Amino acid sequence: NPSSQYNLEKILFKYKGLPIQLDSIEARYLYYGIKSTVDLKKSEELRTQFKKEDLKKSLELGEAMLSDNPTDLETISVVMECYYRQQDSSTKLNHYSNQFRKLVDAMLSSGDGKSEKTAFLVNSVSDEYILLAILRKNTYQMKRTSKPSKEGMYDIWDDNGNKTYINVIYDMKF
């Protein structure tokens, strides 16, 4: 609905221009309303250029990818790191940091991760790993089990009895 305050086009416009002004509800509509589709070839090229420390090429690729897929957390994190390493683009770094923070806050506000019923909701496996890193979970020391959920797949991460539940959703209408 174009007149709705939660119209995705309006929210996306605000997110791209002044992400810090997004409220938490808008951020959730944006994160869960836009399905990230990753171009594997472009993503691999971005990783290759980033590993070579070609920051200029990485930024060109990353920003082009974000114009097509603005909620791709993995690409946003690479672009942020490039600007951080350049140390002369604090405005751009702040902009992408605000976008990243709003999307992560949307994931964190989706649940507490303590049960299936209150599992964190994420749009992709890469977002799941980003969330786990933010929660300071060492996935190498944890055991993961998976089981189907109504919306996608539950991943249950067990760290010596301390479990974190994440629901990787395939398609969610928010």
Place the predicted regions along the sequence by residue.
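Helix-start (N-cap) detector for alpha-helical repeat units in TPR-like alpha-solenoids
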Residues: D39, L73-E74
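TPR alpha-solenoid repeat register
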Residues: S4, T75-I76, L93
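TPR/TPR-like (Sel1-like) alpha-helical repeat modules
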Residues: Y84-L108, R136
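Residue-level signature for tetratricopeptide repeat
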Residues: T48-Q49, M65, M80-Y84
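Canonical tetratricopeptide repeat
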Residues: V78-V79, Y96
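Canonical positions in the second alpha-helix
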Residues: A64-M65, F100
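Short coil turns that delineate tetratricopeptide repeat
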Residues: N69-T71, V104-D105
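N-terminal alpha-helical interaction modules that lie
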Residues: N1-L61, S115-F174
